[in-house]
Amino acid sequence: MQYFFYLCTRKRKILVFMKHIHLFLGILLALLPCQIFASIDMQAHVASDEGKQSYTTYLNKQKSYYTGVYAYDQLLAITGDELFGRLNQLMGNTCKLDAWNLDYGDLRYAYVDVDRDLNRSGYIIGYYDGKQLDGDWGSGWNREHTWPQSKGAKKEITMGHDMQSVRPTNTSVNSSRGNDAYGETGSYYDPNEISISNSAYKKINLGTYRGDAARVILYDYLVYGQAGSYKNSLYNGNAQLLSKLGTSGVFESIHVLLKWHMQDPPSLTEMVRNDGAQDYQGNRNPIIDYPELAIEIFSDYSKITCYPVTYNVAETVSPRYMHTLSDGFVTYLTNRDGSHPSQVSVTGGQYTYDASLGRLIITKVTGNLTISTSTPTIDVAVDVCAQARIYNVAGELVATTMDVHATLPQLRSGLYIISQGTQSRKVFVP
């Protein structure tokens, strides 16, 4: 039995962004070739975070972005300061906000492409609540600085008009956050408290925007932070981001960000939006493309303990996955007929399970984990240290434990995750 990913095919169009096009759209459409105004052709923009259970051809774009010294295998070979520096350099080389003369005002008319809702023409999806919003500027939404202007991300500087971190948001929702720091307790703003309000989508509240918010802040640090300072600034609080921690800052702690990042992994929404943001300004968010890189850069490995994880699948699979003592992970369980197990039991950890989604959240690891289900499943194995995963799309097994049993040329076109102990490899088969 083997598991594999498949790609949903879609066409891509080239976005040629023209500043202030809204003022002359009627005239220009009559005078210029329609190709000039080709917009981003994006896959369905879902408002729920159900993990990477399906992919679009965004992977083609992702693959071409990480090449040379920035190729995935090269990034995997380094950690910590060196990895931070490498990604910081990649962001500097590819971000074209200044080169393309894009500013804060341009965001108002780019969201209709980058954040558009394909279920309703001319509408966009609001950040934090998933609400359908009229894509025209002035229709009840504004621009949310996930890293507040009052705390450094002024709209006049590049960081303050970066498409990756400034999001279209329902005006009232934006006001409710204000400039509060992200966090879970006290006066912090917790994006987990916002419910999905778009009736066209399944309502999922658990961790809906926590992971999204964490990955934006980690992105901001990668692009605009200083190489070599992350440990001091995020752990000891005496360098680059000293003023950005706590209630008076931007986020509660790096521990909270990594927890949200691990327990609420990138959704299809984020993946597809990453394409649109790249079309707009040239660079991607590596933390969305390769979630494990955040752990390699920011995690304090002295706090990590190894536990074996056993699933009751058809073949006995008992790889050793690393888990922190305080944090868990999210995984998805699917039966071979496409349904989800009705019951799940776990020993060695605390957990919650949603049978309607097949989503199992291990909230705390206390010992050797054993995950059992009511029926044999196509399972998902998660490595919190490196975010290694075997996803549950129907198909053939790519790897078991340390051994690769599949011959890649025999596999269908798509992305495959090969998990090897605490390492994972993404292999794209064209």
Describe each model-derived feature in a short phrase.
Residues 309-374:
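Secondary-structure capping and domain/repeat boundary segments
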Residues 132, 136-310:
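Domain-level detector of nuclease and nuclease-like folds
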Residues 368-389, 403-410:
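Glycine-centered coil/turn sites that cap beta-strands in beta-rich domains
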